[in-house]
From Swiss-Prot:
Locations listed in the record: Mitochondrion outer membrane
Organism of derivation: Kluyveromyces lactis (strain ATCC 8585 / CBS 2359 / DSM 70799 / NBRC 1267 / NRRL Y-1140 / WM37)
Summary of the function given for this chain in its UniProt record: Mitochondrial GTPase involved in mitochondrial trafficking. Probably involved in control of anterograde transport of mitochondria and their subcellular distribution.
GO biological process: mitochondrion organization; small GTPase-mediated signal transduction
EC number: 3.6.5.-
Enzyme superclass (EC): hydrolase
Name by which UniProt lists this protein: Mitochondrial Rho GTPase 1
Cytoplasmic side: 1-631
EF-hand domain boundaries: 199-234, 328-363
Binding site for Ca(2+) 2: 341, 343, 345, 352
Matches recorded under InterPro entries: EF-hand-dom_pair, EF_Hand_1_Ca_BS, EF_hand_assoc_1, EF_hand_assoc_2, EF_hand_dom, Miro, MIRO_dom, P-loop_NTPase
Binding residues for Ca(2+) 1: 212, 214, 216, 223
Residues engaged in binding GTP 2: 453-460, 489-493, 558-561
Membrane topology: Single-pass type IV membrane protein
Taxonomic placement: Eukaryota, Fungi, Dikarya, Ascomycota, Saccharomycotina
Length: 659
């Protein structure tokens, strides 16, 4: 329920006991003399034991002498508590009151209450058969006088007998009014055909799949117990559980209503059909708050959609910070992978992926747009591996963390989705000799690299090689952006995830977008060392977008296994690198595995320590850094020596003076 405050308007003919019901509700006693109309009364949440009750409930008494005020209150109501007490006031329910609501355009749930059932209450009390438990709702009735109204007016959700004089069902009537808002039956159950509605069925099926931890198609006793604790914060009663299973077995036996269904299998548990039938029975018997208790625990709203605030929580991300998975997030995705890898072959095949994403809208659009699963590591059967699975979620979180939080909830993450994420520190810049450069990075595990270069220079082959795939001679120009993501390990055992992006026809728009460049940790400038026209593209790119020099750069001479050509450019690659004070190009070939590994490690190290490959930071700057540190050390040494000398001199002087 999204409402924190609901408004109950009590109406009905004069003399039916509206004011007495409200007074009895608030004072817990019958008051014989009252004013005609009570002012609005606010009842706090602690009046009810339900954890889904609203923070405040306003009960509004009405009179019939001022129709304008009555109409105004009805239009501002959330639920109508319609009271009658005898045959005449009963007749006016259909002829007057329901017609008034419709003429006003008031399409609200109505709780019909027959007050002044004093004689019946006295009889039940004298016979000792009146249920004294105020929390029981079995006193809700559907005898002959209610059936025509329930059939004719879909707005009437439930009916109840009450007596303000004997404090009978007053609290229950109030609770029923609250429940029409907190736990509405209309979204769940179609009373005309006696079936759960399609959206309700979908939601309950998802709950079943998420609760079926061993994925055997049954909810066993342990799984039901865990579901009960999650939804209602209490353990299930063993006898009650057995009664539910016996009921399902009974109604699915031959010649019974569900004889064509398997609802419960002894020794295994309740089936998905059994779970749906159970919740249908709850709705039929007016116990749909139980179903809502289950759905609320899985973050469903009144429209049977998952709460957007839960799916996409608002997170304040400082400028130049990035979002990564936390250890808790990685643990969840590891567990999810292992749970659905039924054949334990280390990969998720199509059937396993179908089961895994059954509780979601399907594969994330981001994955589909980036050629899933071939943007990351797959096995020989083209099934995504655990390594690729984690790399993919690392990339997804980096590019759009809201997709990750959304799927965390869809897949059954039972904590705040923000707990599965962590935000890196804002990237800092330093300045030396008038040149800005990025400070070293210590807390990032996911790094982003843009690969730039002339067409047919070998960038796509490099992406494939990054994922351990063999070289292909076939050439296909890159139109749409391509992306690859994989993990790699540096010296010391630290693991990182590197995202390589080939921009295709989006290259110019992305390079013109400073925000997109802020997301880039390192530029990989590629040229074909066997094509004399290739390097000039890199030079013109840097001339056009001069601010690219602010990013760490790695030059790469691809196709190094072919004959090296002199570049037809006013400056050669090594000279250009010297001019920018960065390393000479790495000579790489997709057929030389060792050179590839060297490149990917180099890209990662440069992203972590940008000063080593930022244009314009020449040896003088680095020397100044060293000289500066040496100066600090020298000054510290002098100060330390002077302090020691002074201390020693004072000790000698003090000793001499005492002598």
């Amino acid at each position: 329920m999204t409402k924190t405050r609901i408004r109950i308007v009590v109406c009905g003919d004069s003399g039916v006991g509206k004011t007495s019901l409200i007074a009895c509700l608030v004072k817990d006693q019958f008051i014989s003399w009252l004013q005609d109309v009570l002012p609005p009364i606010t009842i706090p949440k602690d009046f009810s034991s339900s954890r889904y009750s609203p923070e405040n409930t306003v009960v509004v008494d009405t009179g019939n002498s001022d129709l304008a005020t009555l109409h105004k209150e009805l239009k501002n109501a959330d639920v109508i508590w319609l009271v009658y007490s005898d045959h005449d006031s009963y007749e006016r329910i259909a002829l007057y009151w329901m017609m008034m609501f419709r003429s006003l355009g008031v399409n609200l749930p109505v709780v019909l209450c027959r007050n002044k059932c004093d004689d019946e209450v006295e009889f039940l009390s004298s016979a000792n058969i009146m249920d004294s438990d105020d929390d029981q709702l079995d006193n809700k009735i559907e005898d002959e006088e209610f059936i025509p109204i329930l059939r004719e007016f879909k707005e009437v959700e439930t009916c109840i007998k009450a007596s303000a004089k004997f404090k009978f069902n007053v609290n229950q009537a109030f609770y029923l009014c609250q429940r029409t808002i907190t736990n509405p039956v209309a979204p769940l159950f179609d009373a005309r055909i006696g079936e759960l509605k399609p959206l309700g069925v979908l939601a309950l099926k998802r709950v079943f799949v998420l609760s079926d931890m061993d994925q055997d198609g049954f909810l066993n006793d342990d799984e039901i117990t865990k579901l009960q604790k999650k939804c209602f914060s209490k353990a299930v009663d063993v006898n009650e559980l057995q009664f539910l299973k016996d009921t399902l077995t009974s109604i699915s036996s031959p010649n019974q209503e569900y004889e064509d269904y398997i609802l419960n299998v002894p020794g295994k548990g309740i089936t998905k059909d059994g779970f749906l039938v159970l919740n249908k029975i709850y709705a039929e018997k007016g116990r749909h708050e139980t179903t809502w208790g289950i759905l609320r625990a899985f973050h469903y709203t009144d429209t049977l959609t998952i709460n957007e605030k839960i799916l996409r929580p608002k997170i304040d991300i400082p400028q130049s910070s990035s979002v990564e998975l936390s250890p808790l997030g990685y643990r969840f995705f590891v567990d999810t992978f292992l749970k659905y890898d039924k054949d334990n072959d280390g990969g998720l095949n199509n059937d396993e992926l179908h089961l895994l994403f059954k509780t979601t809208p399907g594969l994330p659009h981001l994955w589909i747009e980036t050629n899933f699963p071939f943007l990351t590591v797959v096995n020989n059967s083209a099934c995504i591996t655990l390594q690729g699975w984690l790399a993919l979620w690392s990339m997804t979180t980096f590019i759009d963390y809201s997709v990750t939080t959304e799927y965390l909830i869809y897949l059954g993450f039972d904590k705040d989705a923000k707990n599965a994420l962590q935000i890196t520190k804002p990237r800092r810049k330093r300045r030396r000799n008038g040149v800005y450069y990025r400070a070293p990075v210590f807390d990032r595990k996911v790094l982003n690299c843009y690969m730039l270069g002339k067409g047919n220079s070998g960038k796509s082959s490099l992406l494939e090689s990054f994922l351990g795939r063999s070289f292909s001679e076939a050439y296909s120009p890159t139109i749409r952006p391509k992306i690859s993501v994989n993990s790699l390990e540096l010296k010391g055992g630290k693991q990182y995830y590197l995202i390589l992006q080939e921009l295709g026809e989006q290259e110019t728009p992305i390079l013109e977008n400073k925000g997109k460049l802020d997301e880039c940790d390192v530029l990989c400038l590629c040229y074909d060392s066997s094509d004399p026209e290739s390097f000039s593209y890199i030079v013109s790119l840097i001339d056009k977008f001069d601010y690219l020099k602010e990013l760490p750069i790695v030059f790469v001479a691809l196709k190094a296994d072919l004959d090296k050509q002199q570049q037809r450019c006013h400056i050669q690659p090594d000279d250009f690198a010297d001019q920018l004070f960065i390393d000479h190009p790495l000579h790489i070939s997709s057929t030389w595995p060792s050179s590839l590994n060297e490149l990917f490690i180099k890209l990662t190290e440069v992203a972590l320590e940008p000063i080593t490959s930022t244009a314009g930071l020449g040896p003088a700057v680095l020397t100044n850094d060293i000289d500066y540190r040496q100066t600090i050390v020298a000054i510290s040494s002098v100060v330390g020596f002077a302090s020691l000398f002074t201390f020693t001199a004072l000790k000698i002087y003090s000793s001499f003076k005492n002598t």
